[in-house]
Amino acid sequence: MKTPLLVSHLLLISLTSCLGEFTWHRRYGHGVSEEDKGFGPIFEEQPINTIYPEESLEGKVSLNCRARASPFPVYKWRMNNGDVDLTNDRYSMVGGNLVINNPDKQKDAGIYYCLASNNYGMVRSTEATLSFGYLDPFPPEDRPEVKVKEGKGMVLLCDPPYHFPDDLSYRWLLNEFPVFITMDKRRFVSQTNGNLYIANVESSDRGNYSCFVSSPSITKSVFSKFIPLIPIPERTTKPYPADIVVQFKDIYTMMGQNVTLECFALGNPVPDIRWRKVLEPMPTTAEISTSGAVLKIFNIQLEDEGLYECEAENIRGKDKHQARIYVQAFPEWVEHINDTEVDIGSDLYWPCVATGKPIPTIRWLKNGYAYHKGELRLYDVTFENAGMYQCIAENAYGTIYANAELKILALAPTFEMNPMKKKILAAKGGRVIIECKPKAAPKPKFSWSKGTEWLVNSSRILIWEDGSLEINNITRNDGGIYTCFAENNRGKANSTGTLVITNPTRIILAPINADITVGENATMQCAASFDPSLDLTFVWSFNGYVIDFNKEITNIHYQRNFMLDANGELLIRNAQLKHAGRYTCTAQTIVDNSSASADLVVRGPPGPPGGLRIEDIRATSVALTWSRGSDNHSPISKYTIQTKTILSDDWKDAKTDPPIIEGNMESAKAVDLIPWMEYEFRVVATNTLGTGEPSIPSNRIKTDGAAPNVAPSDVGGGGGTNRELTITWAPLSREYHYGNNFGYIVAFKPFDGEEWKKVTVTNPDTGRYVHKDETMTPSTAFQVKVKAFNNKGDGPYSLIAVINSAQDAPSEAPTEVGVKVLSSSEISVHWKHVLEKIVESYQIRYWAGHDKEAAAHRVQVTSQEYSARLENLLPDTQYFIEVGACNSAGCGPSSDVIETFTRKAPPSQPPRIISSVRSGSRYIITWDHVVALSNESTVTGYKILYRPDGQHDGKLFSTHKHSIEVPIPRDGEYVVEVRAHSDGGDGVVSQVKISGVSTLSSGLLSLLLPSLGFLVFYSEF
């Protein structure tokens, strides 16, 4: 949406008088001289609306005004359209700034503006309001307590004290400062009135509440007396429907501002709040708070205007509220006035255009005083109209100023700044314009001479209104000295230049038309004759646009021949269809130019067909029509229709009717399509030079539905739980659904039965159906088959498959269940085999004593196994264990529960290796005894692993001593790992490296490297 425009023009015609009280024109005689560098005031800083806190300790306030001008400006202030009395001690000026000491609300509140002037004129600043801000304290009286039943909604009123301005922010204290309430879906503090809303009261809401009010404009905060809130307990809290109690009103806002809408509802349970813009999408800059109670629209635009709705809903009901946002716009310049110089006696068109909503009005100031309203036209104006002008656009929401200085020029003609060229070149037979542009006001009269001969207008010679001299059909005799004379009522002046005649530039070898195929090269020749005293350049253009040979993309295809003088030959390499068109060679000097053109035809594959339309949509075919594209100078031989379904990103050639679409056809059918499938279509054309670009794809269409014609595959099943028949199949992919309401019909009967039982499965993605029948005999053979259906009919049945119904779960529980505690983390469980043939596996369930049975872990073993090992158990922990027999139908009854305890954890301290000493052909490794902690298993011995460095396997020793002898390695390094052993398992490892070299290097003998090592167990240990 665009804001309306207001256009105002200042038209100055025949400027004729003087400036009045300003004297600058007197200094310069009859007008502004060329040396005049002065200018009127231009504001660099203007006063802004200011709020002075009544309780401020500063004791003064400043309103700023600063202008740039030459000479320096003089400043003056006005308040409520009266002059500010600067003789009063309370007022002072610092530069252009007004300083008010000890501001008084009764005397100083009002509207201020600044005037800045010098001898060029006066300008008036924007208006600024000085107001006095305050925030009174809350009344000292105590606030009564509030009692509310739990589950009911509640509002605590803030009732803020008297204040100015209105931009307050609100928070609520709970019991003490600075504990503030956090807003959520249940609690909301309105920033409109400050009230605290609780959707439904809970017992946790009990406490003392205080409304905390802040005024950011005067940086002051106050808070109310505390309000005791006492929730009344209820046996059961009754739900009640949503009730919107915080409602937003119709608002008018300004474009570019941020808008906040509040909406909060009481209700039990807490209502959910949703926002929408009625009949339109929400603004892209809209944000909804986490609680949902606040909608913020940032940088609102005109198109965001409209009706907004919030809806609150819980399980008991919903409530709605609507209000409208009206978006207005500050005035904004579309075109404004600028500093302007005009000749005395001339005309001026000075536009002033503003936009806004509502439409702004235009008024004018001259030298700070009201001058005119609306469109301003000035006739027959002189020096009196010079000065500072201000165009003011204003509506109900704002005012903008455009300032400009109007200078009146009055001076005798002078060529000092712009003399005639001393030497002018012109080609024989051509045309020349000799400019004559002196500075003069009013506009002078012009005359010309050649040598001693006065020139007058003729068929070849024309003196323009601006003083320029035009000569056509130039001959050698036109060469010579020319003088321009300019005269006005202020004086006269002249300027002289010499016209030199040169030979004309002519194309002597023009480019000729060419006809090529895509990928070939073409040469455009061009040569010219020219005056030898001048430099010649060639410029090539394509279809009216100059070819830029410096661009990398251009250099790929265009190349110029610089080898020959006066030759501008152009080579077009690897030409493409886009290079076909008109090429123009221009030979040019600084004096004249000559051009010649030729056409390049590039033959290639056809362009894309256009206007593709889809008609007569059926289940397996559609009719297509299109319009013929460009044949690119080679007749189209055939068309190809291509399709793409919603299930694929690839385009494929479609089968068509007729099978071959001749090049003179513009319609055909695509056949053998999939029913009830979404398709896109496109058409490509082919000629002898290749296949062209495809047409723009059609809109996506869906073919009509049809009954399925594909049967499900992989029909089978069996297994399941007691009294179940499980039937499975491979679901048909989406492309074979062929219609809406797709599903499956499952048919089954006992192997020797006569009558088929049929059931309907409506889920198109499922491939499984389970039939439950308490009378069904376990492990009974059934014949099954499946077919698909949709709203158009049924498809064919699949091949018949034979499956068995589920067998019964085992009926006996394992007996003689026993356990053996192996360590702190392992238990071995064993049981007696169940004799039933239908047992396929055993399941061991176990759980810790501090856990519930529902959290039990499970271990499954085959029916041939009668024991299992439980690992990763907690040390020193009570466990319960039971065993059950299972098959595909489920598990039978469990055994009696066995209670047992894991052993304490193994020692956590590694053995500290004291020494590693070589003695003859052996090493003696010695370590400290490991003492177990109170919650650890007692050390019963030590395990020593002797292995090559870098390998995990080695030789394992055990001992009750604190040392061991191991052989010296034959070659390389070995690692000796030592760990304590206990009933709870093996402890943490220590290790040392030993070497097989004759002299033991201290660097190879590392003392204790505590870590959790890789533990290798051997059955013989």
Curated annotation (Swiss-Prot):
User: One biological-process term from Gene Ontology?
Assistant: cell-cell adhesion
Annotated ranges, domain Ig-like C2-type: 41-131, 137-223, 241-326, 331-407, 413-500, 504-603
Residue span(s) of the pro-peptide: 1002-1021
- Glycosites: 208, 258, 338, 457, 473, 494, 521, 593, 935
The domain of life for this entry's organism is Eukaryota
Subunit notes for this chain?
Answer: Monomer. Interacts with NOTCH1. Interacts with CNTNAP1 in cis form and TNR. Binds to the carbonic-anhydrase like domain of PTPRZ1. Detected in a complex with NRCAM and PTPRB. Interacts with TASOR.
Q: What does this protein do?
A: Contactins mediate cell surface interactions during nervous system development. Involved in the formation of paranodal axo-glial junctions in myelinated peripheral nerves and in the signaling between axons and myelinating glial cells via its association with CNTNAP1. Participates in oligodendrocytes generation by acting as a ligand of NOTCH1. Its association with NOTCH1 promotes NOTCH1 activation through the released notch intracellular domain (NICD) and subsequent translocation to the nucleus. Interaction with TNR induces a repulsion of neurons and an inhibition of neurite outgrowth.
* Protein name as it appears in the record: Contactin-1
Query: To which species is this protein native?
Result: Rattus norvegicus
